[in-house]
Amino acid sequence: MNDFNYRRRHSSTVQIGNVPLGGDNPIRIQSMTSTSTLDTDASVAQCRRIFDAGADYVRLTAQGVREAHNIGEIRAALHAAGYTKPLVADIHFNPKAAFEAAATTDKVRINPGNFVDAARTFKKLEYTDEEYAAELEKIRRAVVPFLAICREHHTAVRLGVNHGSLSDRIMSRYGDTPAGMVESAMEYLRIFREENFNDVAISIKASNTVIMVETVRRLVAEMDREDMHYPLHLGVTEAGDGEDGRIKSAVGIGTLLAEGIGDTVRVSLSEEPELEIPVALKLVDYITAREGHAPINGCFAKAYNRIAPERRPTNAVGSIGGQNVPVVATALSPADVAAIATKPDFFLSDVNWKAVDASDKSEGFSDDDVLLLTSHHANPVGEIEAFIHRLWDNGCKAPVVVRMSYDDANEEDVQVKAGADFGALLLNGLVDGIVLDAPNLPNNADAVAYSFGILQAARRRTTKTEYISCPSCGRTLYDLQHAVKEIKAATSHLKGLKIGIMGCIVNGPGEMADADYGYVGAAVGKVSLYKGKECVERNVPQDVALTHLIDLIKANGDWTEPKQ
């Protein structure tokens, strides 16, 4: 068995307009508009910007039949201007809108969590097996006519499962779990297969990269068991903006791409949608460049759980390994990092490392060694993983710190590449620390900040405030980008606090399930505020909402004054 070589998962081909997905086609790139779908001119202009940036597909929200119909008008205007790539309608809660969109767009995204099932209320529902089967039959009665319209108009479908919008029915039987997310998709896929409708792709997303990666792996395993090979759409929902959003997306998406999983990618940023495209292109190009590399021999360790990995057991050498959080070390000097807030745990000169290249096949390592592991392979993550799995199977518990170097001078390039590489190693539980060398960055110390950002994005260590912010869409009725910047500026000193900033209620309360506080769009220029899952204040005007949010944080004892 050979577990560490890059090769794409085999998937079936789905025809989406004039840009097919899956099979031997390239990994496709997409984004979503943030304009009102009823504003034809603004939507056309934004679609053009997204396509000009390099997107293969653009998705537009369709809250109702009017919006779904108008996507057809937008499509016609784009075609008249020479833009013929596919448009996708995004549907939640409204099957009638999906029926209309099936006749006006190239693909319709439906959400199994709310296409037939009511919006989630977080209530526990009790079903007998017979009652549960009746609910599935209700889904079939709604889905089959929809598929008939799609078939008539040669319209593809995406089943888009979101962690934040699982139905109460699924939650009651499976819990708020990866298994529940997978079953939410499989219920629909089984109907699609029985109806011989094959132009379907699947996404299964979460804002938590650990859950997102585990769930996609579970879905692939379940589809393999049932001999399904539908193409997969990858994304981390509510990844945020700036450095954090790019790193978090690279950690989640990059980990799966490196395993050969994924046929289309959307990097969700709380920014203008066309800015998502270069990030996605860089990520896909970086991973797919590994194709055809020199073979890496090795197998997963016997104790390794490839679906939901736990951390490799290691010996604690000082504060490295064992039960210690993964460390950040640097080759920079103390003077180089004097100005940054969170200092590295170690300078390379502080520790008696045992430097090893991952191509080394020797086995003479002590449990008291701290291995500083590097790779010069075209697929460095694969070679590093093979080395560590060999250690594991040989019973060696020496902690491993991985050092990787990037020659790029562009900050985004380093964020994407390092996020994908270190993110995979961290999510797979294989490393006890990281060293990120980026000597050509304008500010060398940024490499240390990126290192801590990667650890936090992989849910391995928290060193700053966590923001769960969505990219906005046509459902968002307030200035989300401004709100994100404003909230970050006021709360970024609250280390360890999680704040959700969401455009609307589609995923809002659900994706914020583990957030401490939430700021969710409610109406034009108004938001609702949450403490955990509980809405504590509704319809707050945006111009005073930040003050109300800070007051809420203070009232619950989570506020500290920023240091001057």
Give the label of every model feature segment.
Residues 62-104, 335-338:
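N-terminal active-site wall of soluble small-molecule enzyme domains
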Residues 24-42, 86-94, 169-182, 237-247, ...:
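Active-site mouth loops of central-metabolism enzymes
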Residues 84-122, 129-149, 153-154:
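Hydrophobic or amphipathic alpha-helical targeting/insertion segments
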Residues 29, 90, 159, 202, ...:
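Conserved, mostly hydrophobic/aromatic
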Residues 56-59, 105-121, 259-274, 429-442, ...:
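Glycine-rich phosphate-binding active-site loops on the catalytic face of alpha/beta enzymes
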Residues 126-143, 148, 171-315, 364-494, ...:
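Catalytic alpha/beta core domains of metabolic enzymes, predominantly
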Residues 1-31, 147, 151-153, 289-335, ...:
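N-terminal amphipathic alpha-helix/helix-capping segment at the start of soluble metabolic enzymes
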Residues 34, 53-78, 112-134, 200-209, ...:
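Glycine-rich, proline-tolerant flexible connector loops at the mouths of alpha/beta enzymes
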